């Protein structure tokens, strides 16, 4: 049956900011869904709070509302737009939870909005642990022995009855939040308390642990007529016990017998039919490796991280088809976009192997607990495709950008066998390297299988890789013959890995390959195992059979993507890459994307003319360049990942469009940059590059503390810190020089001024600044973690003039063609430059949307030779809009045990939301609500622990908050200070005093907000850390910068009815 004619206007709910457990995959699926609906003539209204996405571009939906994802704001959009339908399954867990809340609160019924796609009843049956378990029992699908609990004591009683270990799974949460495996009652109490608080319905499933069983997933599609297919089945290399988002995953599954495969396929179809899914659904099973016993773990009745992976692994666009099914189409009525011949009811066939490896953020968090479990901690992932497992796996390892090209890891060489055993039994993000080291020392595969639950098939494959590494280490380059090299390449070894083992350069291996004509061939991802001719230009490299790439004679450009999502390099760079491709297409240039992230829009096969799903390493990128012979390569939009290739491409005489390697070096090399600033008469905070701890101490003495220290050539403020005394500086420098001895450490005088930022475009003669952005928090908080305001609110015309002057001088002197990002500090009336990035930055999507200047489009045209004066947006500073927009950071620290919450110069946020208002206070209110930072006033209490440097600044803010009804709880010093100023305050004991003390108050959630300004270098930092962690783990707001608290107080003082007076704004207008 074709299109349901009653559907005219659909509201799509996005997934909001990127957090751990809900990343770029929902930008990809949401964008696909909106485009599928529009292609059918449906009017699409989108609400999503995330400005960094392609999904929130004005071209993707007919109406776009960048508003907080709360019932109040969604109701305002419904009232204004009057959609007839709601599509909920494209916004991840956030979208599902909101759809259920909209239904249960009566809003959908009130405005006569129907849910299309999977129904609310089916969502509840899939998400509510009790309803799901009951249904499985009804249809005869096995589930693990379990109990639904809503309080602590019932959970303890059940665990005692069935025995430990038990798995805790909260209902309606994201990425396993609040869950875990408890080995005893003490652990259960901690996990259960967290799970009950984080579940939106206060419900947790406790189940007997089947840790060590295989974890298998099926991605299934079903239409409203009951047609049902499995798109892809995937096997987690890590067994049950590690969240699938933190597992290495292989598709198709490699170790299932045909009987096991068919058994689980039948079960997944049985489940999806019984729940009544209409669209896509992910089903997770645990499978006993020794018998045919299996159990259903859970389902996701929506598109998910796994469905994005399955879409990219097979070329089958799940989200697009789910949207079409929601409109009434059957699977047998929708054409396969890849073949244009077959229909969506044909199950995809894979004649290659896909490996997904998670990307974890532990490089950002010194001292983090890295142990993996049922709670997801990865920020992103890479995907690699190969003709065999070894090839895909080794491609995956080098795609992670952790400096590893093989399984040989120096760190594990010093470990004893019992230490290695511990490491593989309590897995962390580096377990695979510990495993390889055990195999290198001939530890028996059977024993490793027993202690880890990892299938012998995978262990044997890893053993083969390790043995080849050892063989290479014992050889010389003269021993490497054509056959051996060819075999190593077929199994995924990179030139660099081979060269490192043979102690020669990658160039030596490249020359041998050239002499022997060992070149990669590129195969097409075609959904049908070569059965039908495919039209998708989507390729992966192998060293196998013939090449399927047709190289054209058109003028072509290669755009290098940004790789996996990580803190400091997120979805913003994918946004820039996609817009670059779109701009090139308009210029009739053939576009080629190279990227390895399965979650993103850039790796959708119909975005570019050709997509190469490959690692972003020198060798892999060079192979594609040699194949395609492009006019040039664009690195500017792929973040630091792409920029790192600049020098290599220069050595190979490959043309980079826009900014060159020398220009990048001028901006990033401290001495060259200082010389440039001096020549241009531009100020910067005093400082220099130092090469030893002693030199650092001398420089700090000359500058005076506090000083800002950081490595050179980093992104996201990685490794950056403000140090207040010699002890802290020695600790920092000692660690920094251990990590990197080849580059200097930069040391600057720290100025606590106003931070200002611009993204500008230069054509070599003129510049265009779309907008001047001002940071709410003073310098010292990383720009990615600051609340950013546009138009700037406190920057005078004189300073704006200087910003224009300095930006123009720098862009022209460096020779920028395209994008440049500059960060300034205004301090005591003077303007200083603190950083110049000769590339697109993470603020590009935000400033593009709020200034309505298509920045990437203009920058791309400029790179291809256009002049700013001819492009219709003028030069110098673009006119400011009437509305005020604020970008508010969103953090995922709750998901990462034992990591610091406090704001500082190293970036910690994973995502962002936008607040748009008629004035700054309205915009801030929306931004804080959208980021879940606004105090709920449920209890009206603020816990304040303020260090001595901040007490004078804190008092006027506290007075204002007291005026609007907040009460304070504080330790002795802060309490005394508040009372002296006539502010009502309740005293609380410190951590080391008897209970109930300050930590108990936080743990019992007796406050709405914790304000804690950290002290450095003494014991109270430890107290502060414990308080901040306890608050974050209980979902309480934590503020560590008084500028943020000042802004909240200003919003609270504002006399507007927060429900009635706030408008919602369509940004397409």
UniProtKB/Swiss-Prot annotation:
Region (Carboxyphosphate synthetic domain), start-end ranges: 1-401
Residues that hold Mg(2+) 3 according to the record: 823, 835
Protein residues bound to ATP 1: 129, 169, 175-176, 208, 210, 215, 241-243, 284, 298
UniProt source species: Clostridium botulinum (strain Eklund 17B / Type B)
Listed SUPFAM superfamilies: Carbamoyl phosphate synthetase, large subunit connection domain, Glutathione synthetase ATP-binding domain-like, Methylglyoxal synthase-like, PreATP-grasp domain
Annotated CDD domains: MGS_CPS_II
Protein name per the record: Carbamoyl phosphate synthase large chain
GO cellular component terms given for this protein: cytoplasm
Protein residues bound to Mn(2+) 2: 298, 300
């Amino acid at each position: 049956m074709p299109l349901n004619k009653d559907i005219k206007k659909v509201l799509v709910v996005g997934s909001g900011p990127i957090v751990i457990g809900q990343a770029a995959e929902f930008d990809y699926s949401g964008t696909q869904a909106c485009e599928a609906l529009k292609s059918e003539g449906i009017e699409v209204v989108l609400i999503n709070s995330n400005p960094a996405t392609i999904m929130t571009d004005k071209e993707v939906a007919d109406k776009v509302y960048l508003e907080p994802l709360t019932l109040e704001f969604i109701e305002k959009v419904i009232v204004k737009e009057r959609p007839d339908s709601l599509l909920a399954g494209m916004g991840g867990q956030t979208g599902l939870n909101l759809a259920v809340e909209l239904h249960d609160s009566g809003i959908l019924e009130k405005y006569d909005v129907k849910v299309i796609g999977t129904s609310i009843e089916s969502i509840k049956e899939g998400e509510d642990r009790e309803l799901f378990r009951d249904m499985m029992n009804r249809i005869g699908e096995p589930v693990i022995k379990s109990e639904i609990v809503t309080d602590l004591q019932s959970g303890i009683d059940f665990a005692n009855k069935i025995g430990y270990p038990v798995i805790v799974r909260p209902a309606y949460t994201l990425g396993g939040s609040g869950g875990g495996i408890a080995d005893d009652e003490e652990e259960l109490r901690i996990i259960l308390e967290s799970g009950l608080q984080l579940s939106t319905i206060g419900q947790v499933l406790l189940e007997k642990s089947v840790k060590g069983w295989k974890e298998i997933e099926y991605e299934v599609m079903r239409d409203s007529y009951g047609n049902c297919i499995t798109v892809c089945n995937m096997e987690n290399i890590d067994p049950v016990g590690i969240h699938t988002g933190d597992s290495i995953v292989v598709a198709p599954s490699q170790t299932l017998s045909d009987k096991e495969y068919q058994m689980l396929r039948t079960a997944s179809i049985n489940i999806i039919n019984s729940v009544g899914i209409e669209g896509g659904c992910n089903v997770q099973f645990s499978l006993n490796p020794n018998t045919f016993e299996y159990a259903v773990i859970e389902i996701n009745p929506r598109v998910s991280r796994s469905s994005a992976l399955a879409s990219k692994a097979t070329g089958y666009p799940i989200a697009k088809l789910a949207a079409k099914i929601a409109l009434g189409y059957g699977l047998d009525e929708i054409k396969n976009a890849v073949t244009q011949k077959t229909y969506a009811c044909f199950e995809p066939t894979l004649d290659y192997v896909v490996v997904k490896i998670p990307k974890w953020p532990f490089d950002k968090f010194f001292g983090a607990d890295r142990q993996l479990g049922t709670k997801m901690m990865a920020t992103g992932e890479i995907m690699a495709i190969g003709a065999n497992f070894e090839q895909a796996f080794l491609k995956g390892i080098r795609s992670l950008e952790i400096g590893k090209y093989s399984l040989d890891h120096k760190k594990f060489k010093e470990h004893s066998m019992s230490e290695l055993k511990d490491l593989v039994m309590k897995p962390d993000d580096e377990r695979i390297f510990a495993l390889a080291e055990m195999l290198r020392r001939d530890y028996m595969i059977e024993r490793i299988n027993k202690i880890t639950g990892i299938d012998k098939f995978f262990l044997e494959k890893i053993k083969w890789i390790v043995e080849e590494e050892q063989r290479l280490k014992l050889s010389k380059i003269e021993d490497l013959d054509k056959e051996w090299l060819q075999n190593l390449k077929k199994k995924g070894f990179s030139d660099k890995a081979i060269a490192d083992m043979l102690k020669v350069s990658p160039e030596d291996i490249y020359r041998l390959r050239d002499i022997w004509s060992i070149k990669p061939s590129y195969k097409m991802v075609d959904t049908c195992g070569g059965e039908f001719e495919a039209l998708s230009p989507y390729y992966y490299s192998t060293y196998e059979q013939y090449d399927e790439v047709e190289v054209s004679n058109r003028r072509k450009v290669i755009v290098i993507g940004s790789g996996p999502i990580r803190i400091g390099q997120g979805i913003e760079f994918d946004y820039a890459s996609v817009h670059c491709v779109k701009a090139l297409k308009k210029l009739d240039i053939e576009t080629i994307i190279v990227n390895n992230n399965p979650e993103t829009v850039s790796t959708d096969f119909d975005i570019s003319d050709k997509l190469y799903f490959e690692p972003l390493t020198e060798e892999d990128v060079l192979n594609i360049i040699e194949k395609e012979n492009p006019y040039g390569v664009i690195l500017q939009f792929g973040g630091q990942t792409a920029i790192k290739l600049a020098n290599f491409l220069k050595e190979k005489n490959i043309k980079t469009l826009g900014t060159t390697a020398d220009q990048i070096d001028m901006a990033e090399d401290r001495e060259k940059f200082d010389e440039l600033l001096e020549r241009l008469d531009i100020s910067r905070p005093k400082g220099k590059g130092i090469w030893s701890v002693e030199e650092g101490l001398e420089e700090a003495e000359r500058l005076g503390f506090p000083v800002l220290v950081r490595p050179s050539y980093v992104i996201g403020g990685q490794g950056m810190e403000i140090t207040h005394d010699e002890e802290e500086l020695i600790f920092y420098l000692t660690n920094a020089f251990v990590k990197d001895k080849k580059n200097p450490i930069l040391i600057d005088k720290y100025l606590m001024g106003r931070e200002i930022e611009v993204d500008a475009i230069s054509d070599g003669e003129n510049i265009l600044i779309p907008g001047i952005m001002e940071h709410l928090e003073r310098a010292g908080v990383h720009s990615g973690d600051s609340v950013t305001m546009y138009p700037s609110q406190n920057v005078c015309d004189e300073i704006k003039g200087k910003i224009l002057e300095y930006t123009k001088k720098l862009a022209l002197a460096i020779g920028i063609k395209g994008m440049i990002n500059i960060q300034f500090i205004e301090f005591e009336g003077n303007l200083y430059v603190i950083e110049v990035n000769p590339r697109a930055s993470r603020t590009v999507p935000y400033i593009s949307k709020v200034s309505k200047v298509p920045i990437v489009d203009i920058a791309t045209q400029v790179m291809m030779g256009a002049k700013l004066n001819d492009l219709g947006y003028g030069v110098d500073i673009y006119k400011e809009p009437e509305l005020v927009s604020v970008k508010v950071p969103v953090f995922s620290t709750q998901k990462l045990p034992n990591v610091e919450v406090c704001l500082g110069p190293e970036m910690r946020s994973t995502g962002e939301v936008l607040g748009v208002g008629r004035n700054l206070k309205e915009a801030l209110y929306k931004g804080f609500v959208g980021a879940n930072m606004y105090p709920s006033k449920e209890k009206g209490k603020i816990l304040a622990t303020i260090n001595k440097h901040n007490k004078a600044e804190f008092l006027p803010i506290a007075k204002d908050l007291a005026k609007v009804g907040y009460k304070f709880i504080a330790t002795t010093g802060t309490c005394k200070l508040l009372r002296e100023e006539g502010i009502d305050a309740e005293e609380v004991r410190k951590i080391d005093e008897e209970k109930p003390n300050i930590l108990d108050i936080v743990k019992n959630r007796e406050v709405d907000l914790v304000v804690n300004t950290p002290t450095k270098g003494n014991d109270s930092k430890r107290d502060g850390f414990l308080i901040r962690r306890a608050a974050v783990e209980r979902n309480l707001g934590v503020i560590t910068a008084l500028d943020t608290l000042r802004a909240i107080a200003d919003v609270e003082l504002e006399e507007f009815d927060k429900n009635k007076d706030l408008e919602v704004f369509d940004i397409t207008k």
